[in-house]
A protein has these predicted regions:
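C-terminal boundary and immediately downstream tail of ABC-type ATPase nucleotide-binding domains
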Residues: 141-162
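ABC family nucleotide-binding domain
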Residues: 1-140
Length: 162
């Protein structure tokens, strides 16, 4: 799971943030954990920051490290909880590009987001929640061009007019 607030261990390097769970939870040896961490840090464009502490990184960089850390656990499904909501607008695109690459690679992702263009472009299914309930569940084209529920129509009218 990738959270909106990153939750990196501030006292550990980027590399250590990506290896600790592999060693403690998956019982990987350190060498294998480091190899896996470097592979995913490379994928998210953060390998050059492997020795840095999180306090030396921007919000977008921290989020990319959090994505690498999650990938190191070899999940079948990756859950993102508002991965861009805590970022400066300039950093959002970097994170969305990484997520787009993951989608293109076939990674199954469940993404809670307000990034409508991203949802439209990358998703195979889109759910709209209102007051804790899914009120519409369909493909992106239908969701954005012909939604069934009035609340979704209202939301999209406001979104598309801004």
């Amino acid at each position: 799971m990738v959270f909106q607030q990153f939750y990196l261990f501030e006292n550990m390097s980027v590399l250590d943030n990506c290896t600790v769970a592999q060693i403690k939870v998956l019982n990987r040896d350190k060498e294998s954990a480091v190899k896996e961490a470097k592979k995913y840090l490379e994928l998210v464009g953060m390998i050059d920051h492997a020795d840095k502490k999180p306090s030396m990184l921007s919000g977008g960089q921290k989020q990319r490290v959090a994505i690498a850390r999650a990938l190191c656990m070899n999940p079948e499904v990756l859950l993102f909880d508002e991965p861009t909501s805590a970022l400066d607008p300039e950093m959002v695109n970097d994170v969305l590009q990484v997520m787009s690459k993951l989608a293109e690679s076939g990674m199954t992702m469940v993404v809670v987001t307000h990034e409508m263009q991203f949802a439209r472009d990358v998703s195979t299914r889109v759910c709209f929640m209102n007051e804790g309930y899914i009120i519409e569940d369909t493909d992106p084209k239908t969701m954005f061009t012909n939604p069934k529920h009035e609340r979704v129509k209202e939301f999209l009218k406001n979104y598309l007019n801004n």
